């Protein structure tokens, strides 16, 4: 509203990347780089191969079975999910567990259709919020 002074937010210290990044930005950058590297990790391909079947007479050649609803989907309609969530990466102490969970073997992964994956992700997010409170 006009005329009222608004309290300024406290400035977050920028201690990383030569004083340009906050701690949150720094850990977000590392988390993003690890997730990107994980997209090319061989067990992800193995998990998809285990859920795959050939389709004859369709425009698409393969379908993948969702581990949650057991329905069959095209490649673009499924995602590889970590059975045990990778967790958070907000500080140095989180790094070993995050990397261990992120780069798990094929038995720690499952193929889910996008709707089932979204439901699982939302449930995990709500659980994390409840535990953080």
Regions found by a protein language model. Give the residues of each.
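The −1 position to Zn-ligating cysteines in a subset of zinc-ribbon hairpins
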Residues: 65, 79, 112
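Short, Lys/Arg-enriched N-terminal segments with co-localized hydrophobic residues
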Residues: 1-5
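Histidine-centered nuclease catalytic patch
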Residues: 71-109
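Intrinsic structural disorder/low-complexity segments
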Residues: 63, 85, 120-123
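Short, charged surface segments at domain edges that flank catalytic/cofactor-binding sites
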Residues: 7-68, 98-107
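Cys/His-coordinated zinc-binding microdomains
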Residues: 69-70, 117
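Short Cys/His-centered divalent metal-binding micro-motifs
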Residues: 103-132
């Amino acid at each position: 509203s006009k005329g009222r002074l608004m309290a300024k937010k406290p400035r977050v210290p920028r201690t990383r990347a030569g004083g340009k990044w906050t701690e949150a930005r720094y850990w977000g950058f590392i988390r993003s780089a690890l997730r990107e590297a994980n997209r090319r990790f061989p067990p992800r391909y193995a998990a998809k191969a285990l859920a795959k079947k050939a389709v004859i007479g369709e425009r698409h050649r393969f379908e993948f079975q969702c581990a949650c609803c057991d329905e069959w989907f095209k490649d673009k309609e499924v995602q590889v999910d970590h059975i045990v969530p990778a967790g958070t990466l907000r500080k140095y102490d989180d790094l070993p567990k995050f990397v261990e969970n992120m780069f798990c073997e094929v038995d720690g992964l499952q193929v889910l259709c996008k709707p089932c994956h979204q439901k699982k992700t939302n449930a995990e997010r709500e659980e994390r919020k409840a535990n953080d409170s």
